[in-house]
Amino acid sequence: YGMTSTDLGDTALCYQLTQACDLLIAAVRRCAAICKRRAFEERDTLCVGRTHGIHAEPMTFGMKFGSWAWEFKRDLDRLKDARKNVAYGAISGAVGTYSSIDPFVEEYVCEKLGLVHDPLSTQVISRDHHAYLAGVLATVAATCERIVTEMRALQKTDTLEAEEPFRKGQKGSSAMPHKRNPITAEKICGLSRVVKAN
């Protein structure tokens, strides 16, 4: 008696979300570092600057990578904030009054899981914590989609300013094995749309 299924479920979900955030933070940090490194490596590599997909003024690939690194840095800051915002736990009984469970249980469990106890939860942890994280995840997905959409455009046969790696033995098409399709970029675009839709 005392602990509700929501006490367990909400607290476990928030713990899982913090662990997922840790993985995402590490991945976004790597993406930012790679883009930053490439920005310096490509700082003198001229390319066509475009607006609305049309040739505009010259720029460098370094500038593109620098722009992406900065965007990932902002995403990293947002993810860290969202992780803090979702790191809550509540083990306070049926309506949040601790009438049948000692507050020490909540404090102990939250401390062990690296969570903060939600000071005014009722039966459930407020969903604004989850919604904020979902919004940040959509923003990170939008960053990824923006980058790979540009990379896909730069890989077109008539442009060919950039291309994905093509492994030995890899086939671009079952009917035309010589093709070098931007498969990774296409997958990232598709997955980012799934994230943004949810």
Kindly give the residue locations of the regions a language model identified.
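Conserved phosphate/anionic-ligand binding catalytic regions in large, soluble enzymes, centered on
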Residues: 2-13, 95, 145-146
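Short, small-residue-rich loop/turn micro-motifs
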Residues: 3, 39, 43, 113, ...
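Long, non-coiled-coil amphipathic alpha-helical linker/lever segments
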Residues: 8-56, 116-129
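Internal glycine-rich alpha/beta core junctions
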Residues: 26-29, 57-198
